Amino acid sequence: MYPTGQQISFQTTPLNVQDPTRMMNLDQSSPVARNETQNGGGIAHAEFAMFNSKRLESDLEAMGNKIKQHEDNLKFLKSQKNKMDEAIVDLQVHMSKLNSSPTPRSENSDNSLQGEDINAQILRHENSAAGVLSLVETLHGAQASQLMLTKGVVGVVAKLGKVNDENLSQILSNYLGTRSMLAVVCRNYESVTALEAYDNHGNIDINAGLHCLGSSIGREIGDSFDAICLENLRPYVGQHIADDLQRRLDLLKPKLPNGECPPGFLGFAVNMIQIDPAYLLCVTSYGYGLRETLFYNLFSRLQVYKTRADMISALPCISDGAVSLDGGIIRKTGIFNLGNRDEVNVRFAKPTASRTMDNYSEAEKKMKELKWKKEKTLEDIKREQVLREHAVFNFGKKKEEFVRCLAQSSCTNQPMNTPR
């Protein structure tokens, strides 16, 4: 190709190699490069704005649901409050009619005699704790309950309930026995310990408690006795019969295998006791009354039947004992009380006071309960209103943040003008 021996010379031209950093700066300063950079950054910013807007939108939806929940709660509470207002008005009308009744509200002589009869039955047991307490009450009246020793004493079992039917009263008294009928009922354990003290050797200190009180009135407690502590009893925690002023327990009636109620079933003993309205609520610090505590523990679900034959026929349905008006007694499942027995001479009183008086007392108790529930509902309404207002405020702040996010996203997505 080339002549042999001919020397070829190459003239080298130096290359102009520029600094990469300078090239980058130069490229970025150019209009085209600047436009490309801005477009790439805009895409990333738009994606972030979209993610942020979706997050804010989700937060707004959750906060809106929270506001609706508070509004639903307020609607329910206000409807409950309106129902209570109507019930209070109806009860006020009922009480007005009772108050204008020609039958006096004060206790009549029959009721007084009934109380004296029960007190006399207890006083016959001279050497009992119940006898001492009843004698102190007879001698000192209302002042007896102000003694430090007796402040926590609710009373004697026999005097804390009444039974409409004399025969049933005797049957229930026989079921419980004299010891339980004369038991001393106390509100709490401190009241129980106040009844009796002991020396260093574990012997009863006759100079303290009920023994000292008995000595002061010429009585000596020679028999052992039961003291029932209400706050230590396991109370009934189920429902009560609706709109029942005596707050009877809503117990399931016994059913035979065919689904029918046994013939002759009259009810549960615990619900056949009439209780003074003052003892239906808040006898214990937990708000329970005597029916849920004392009488539920004495009778549990004791069933009452018309005859012994009815009771025996219902054996498959009896779980906590049963009694019949003709004297039949089943203590527990499988334990029958047979043979002749001496009748307990301390019975529940028969309520012979004016029904008008009883109804008025029950209405007063119901009115007190309704007003208490209304106050609690009003407090719940105020609390729910505060929570709703707080939720609405937070929703407004979040909405402002969402609007700002949308505005920024709109600015980012505007088309850029490419220079010509």
Swiss-Prot record:
Tell me which species this is from. Answer: Arabidopsis thaliana (Mouse-ear cress)
GO biological processes: gene silencing by siRNA-directed DNA methylation; regulatory ncRNA-mediated gene silencing
Please identify the protein, giving its name as recorded: Protein DEFECTIVE IN MERISTEM SILENCING 3
Q: Explain what the UniProt record notes about the effect of disrupting the gene for this protein.
A: Very low levels of RNAi-mediated methylation and derepression of silenced genes. Impaired RNA polymerase V-chromatin associations (Pol V). The mutant idn1-1 fails to establish DNA methylation and exhibits a late-flowering phenotype.
Per the entry, what this protein does is: Component of the RNA-directed DNA methylation (RdDM) machinery, probably by facilitating an RNAi-mediated epigenetic modification involving secondary siRNAs and spreading of DNA methylation, thus leading to gene silencing. Involved in the assembly of RNA polymerase V (Pol V) transcription initiation or elongation complexes at the chromatin, as a component of the DDR complex. Required for de novo DNA methylation.
CC terms in the record's Gene Ontology section: RNA polymerase V complex
Concerning PANTHER family, the annotation shows: EN/SPM-LIKE TRANSPOSON-RELATED (PTHR33566), PROTEIN DEFECTIVE IN MERISTEM SILENCING 3 (PTHR33566:SF6)
The Gene Ontology terms for molecular function here are: protein homodimerization activity
Q: Does the keyword Nucleus apply?
A: yes
Keywords recorded for this protein, A-Z = Coiled coil, Nucleus, RNA-mediated gene silencing
Q: What sections of the sequence does the record tag as coiled-coil?
A: 52-93, 353-386
Q: How does it assemble?
A: Homodimer. Part of the chromatin-remodeling complex (DDR complex) that contains at least DRD1, DMS3 and RDM1. Interacts with CPL1. The DDR complex recruits/activates the RNA polymerases V and acts during siRNA-directed DNA methylation (RdDM). Interacts with SUVH2. Binds to DMS11 and stimulates its ATPase activity.
Q: List localization entries.
A: Nucleus
